[in-house]
């Protein structure tokens, strides 16, 4: 609806320019917001106040001319001026009801992408395969997954790329330690302890470190024995990752893995091509690109090092090769990198070097979707009691157990299998939702007590809200798609719920554009609250007439489907009862 209003305002502005009321060359960002007071309309715009000065008019006078120039629309019943010059738009409830009836008959609930479909690469998760996934991998994995789901739902062709760390000195270290300490595959499955022991040897023994580096050289040269050991490590680590992805209900598979090693053959070409473009400068033996846009505190350009003095390559080299592959081979229109906010400088440099070098042959928009850190309840980095890294699988297991105990306490009569299933859905959902509901760029503190609360903006609350809607239809023995009739909006609570339901597509487009799942979380929480008010004030099963009951059932059905679909787009499973 906001897009419709923006289009109407734009047409009015064009007319006022033609009439000489407004000067040519204006290109204002037309803002349309939800009205705070529904008695003054459903939507409001401050466009008249924005353009009053260039028009040489008082805001209210310009607002009046804008209203007169607005094209007629079946979606708008009237437009009024409020305060210093706000335009308040009142939605036509009959048109709104028709939109919701159409949404109920649509698999996509009326949501359509604002713009043409695109091919989008999502760079997400990217764990270091030398050790197990830890809590620091959670945000990239689940935020990337949610945005990928939303883009696919809106019609984009999404290519997930799990840029795992599967190359480098760390693997030489592991191979050297394995040569010293032959162990079984079962023992090797505990990668964390194996890595810790190998790292200790690497730090304490120069002879061991030299041997480890030598094994890396042999690995890079394609030595069969080293490749076999490397493949063994990689397969074990990827199997660990896959179990975690499945528990998280994340749509990542082995087919999505495109690790650092995949670009090895192109790294020398990257350096050669940068040199051919005249972009390389040798600095202390290293090959660097200097960009004037990026300077240090002393005002000197910062180097983007693509090859060390010893001939080794760096993350920037691999990332440049990945950019070229994603643009020229995958032919992506967008590439979204869900990587820690602290890597912003690195990616801004890589993107600019790629553009300068002509690596982006197919026009591709590159965006670093940075995120903040997850801290402990004390606001400090999330660690175990002894200061170690918290394994992600351990955190998720604890979440399941805590949720199971909570659900068992509330529903002791349920069978244990059902309690376990509910516990897993609630526990995993709670961890994911607590993260996704925060702004992507914000840091947040992890707190089991808050995220497992059945009140407030939490997964348990939303999961319960969905079961409440499902319960209405279970009593009637109907599904959400088995309600005839038409939606008719009379009561204020019906209209409030209907207006919010109609915004689902707009919310999804916001998430798709900005990579911000918290917007969808806020929407679902608000929707659940509006349904609760509607349910309490507008009797469904005890409606006054059959047509009123059908109308309210249809509103409830669309609410249920929207909640379920929204939670699914966040990567959360739903329950029919709790």
From Swiss-Prot:
Pfam families: Arg_tRNA_synt_N, DALR_1, tRNA-synt_1d. GO terms for cellular component: cytoplasm. It comes from the Bacteria. A motif ('HIGH' region) lies at residues 127-137. Keywords: Aminoacyl-tRNA synthetase, ATP-binding, Cytoplasm, Ligase, Nucleotide-binding, Protein biosynthesis. It catalyses: tRNA(Arg) + L-arginine + ATP = L-arginyl-tRNA(Arg) + AMP + diphosphate. It is found in: Cytoplasm. One of its GO terms (biological process) is arginyl-tRNA aminoacylation. Gene3D superfamilies: Arginyl tRNA synthetase N-terminal domain, HUPs, Isoleucyl-tRNA Synthetase, Domain 1. Its EC number is 6.1.1.19. GO terms for molecular function: arginine-tRNA ligase activity; ATP binding. NCBIfam families: argS. Belongs to the class-I aminoacyl-tRNA synthetase family. Monomer. This is Arginine--tRNA ligase. It comes from Pseudomonas putida (strain ATCC 700007 / DSM 6899 / JCM 31910 / BCRC 17059 / LMG 24140 / F1). The gene is argS.
